C-alpha cells in the first residue's frame, strides 16, 4: 500500500504538467489563428501594419523651423476651425492613398468632434499626391475645383468614401464629373475647371513644398510644426495636441 501511494504524487505531477502544456499550446495556436485572421481582414494593430505610403525611404522627420511652419500655413487649399486656435494641425494628403483613407475612416471625425469643432484646433489640408498613384493628382485638382463652388469638403469626403471606385480607373475624370453633379455643383463650370487644369500648378506647388520640408509620404501631419507620420490612432494626435494646448 505504501509503495502504491508513494507513486500517486508523481503521476499527478505529470498529469498537471501535461495539462498545462496542452492548454498553453492551444492558447498559442488560437492566438496565432486570431492574428492571422485580423491581418487578412486588414484589422491588425498599428504595430503590425504599415501606416504610410512613401515616395522613397526617408529618415525620421524632425520639427519644422519657424520659417518652414509659416510657409506651410500660407495659402492652404482648405482650412477649418478657429483661425486663432492655439493649435494648428496640417495634413498632407493623397486621395488615392489607402492610409489616408484609413485616417479619414477611423480618426478624422474624432479629431473634428473633440478638437476642431470645439475651437481648440485649426485644421489645414495640403496636397501630396504620390507619383505612383495614377489618379491622385487629378483627384486633388477635382477637390479644388469643387472648392470654387464651396464644396471642397464635400468632394474631399466623396473621394475618400469611393476611393476604390476611381483609384485605378481609366475614366477618373468622368467619375469626378459625376460626383460634381451628385453634390449639386454646376457641372459645366466644374468640368471646365478640371479639364482646363486650373489647379494643376497649385497642386504641383504643394508637392514642391512637401518635398522642401521633407514630407515624402502620406499621410503626414504637423501639429504646430511637430511631425506625426502615418495613419495614427487618435491617442497619437491627442498626445501632441494636448501638450501644445498646455
Where are the regions that the model predicts?
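C-terminal cap of thioredoxin/glutaredoxin-like
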Residues: 1-55, 108, 177-246
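N-terminal low-complexity, Pro/Thr/Ser-rich intrinsically disordered segments
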Residues: 49-76
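Extracytoplasmic/periplasmic mature domains of Sec-exported, cell-envelope-associated bacterial proteins
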Residues: 65-69, 134, 168, 236-239
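A short beta-strand-turn-helix
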Residues: 70-87, 115
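Short, well-ordered turn and helix-capping elements at secondary-structure junctions
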Residues: 76-77, 127, 207, 225
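Structural alpha/beta surface segment adjacent to cysteine/selenocysteine redox centers
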Residues: 85, 90-181, 186, 213, ...
Amino acid at each position: 500500500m505504501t509503495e502504491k501511494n508513494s507513486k500517486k504524487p508523481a503521476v499527478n505531477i505529470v498529469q498537471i504538467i501535461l495539462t498545462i502544456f496542452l492548454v498553453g499550446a492551444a492558447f498559442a495556436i488560437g492566438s496565432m489563428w486570431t492574428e492571422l485572421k485580423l491581418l487578412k481582414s486588414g484589422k491588425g494593430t498599428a504595430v503590425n501594419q504599415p501606416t504610410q505610403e512613401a515616395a522613397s525611404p526617408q529618415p525620421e522627420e524632425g520639427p519644422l523651423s519657424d520659417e518652414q511652419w509659416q510657409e506651410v500655413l500660407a495659402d492652404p487649399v482648405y482650412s477649418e476651425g478657429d483661425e486663432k486656435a492655439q493649435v494648428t494641425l496640417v495634413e498632407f494628403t493623397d486621395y488615392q492613398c489607402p492610409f489616408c483613407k484609413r485616417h479619414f475612416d477611423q480618426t478624422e471625425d474624432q479629431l473634428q468632434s473633440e478638437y476642431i469643432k470645439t475651437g481648440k484646433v485649426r485644421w489645414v489640408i495640403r496636397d501630396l499626391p504620390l507619383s505612383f498613384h495614377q489618379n491622385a493628382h487629378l483627384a486633388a485638382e477635382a477637390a479644388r475645383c469643387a472648392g470654387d463652388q464651396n464644396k471642397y469638403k464635400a468632394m474631399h469626403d466623396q473621394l475618400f468614401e469611393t476611393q476604390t471606385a476611381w483609384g485605378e480607373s481609366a475614366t477618373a475624370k468622368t467619375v469626378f464629373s459625376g460626383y460634381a453633379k451628385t453634390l449639386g455643383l454646376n457641372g459645366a463650370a466644374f468640368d471646365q475647371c478640371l479639364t482646363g487644369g486650373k489647379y494643376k500648378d497649385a497642386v504641383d506647388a504643394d508637392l514642391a513644398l512637401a518635398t522642401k520640408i521633407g514630407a515624402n509620404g502620406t499621410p503626414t501631419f504637423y501639429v504646430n510644426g511637430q511631425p506625426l507620420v502615418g495613419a495614427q490612432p487618435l491617442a497619437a494626435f491627442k498626445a501632441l495636441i494636448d501638450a501644445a494646448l498646455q
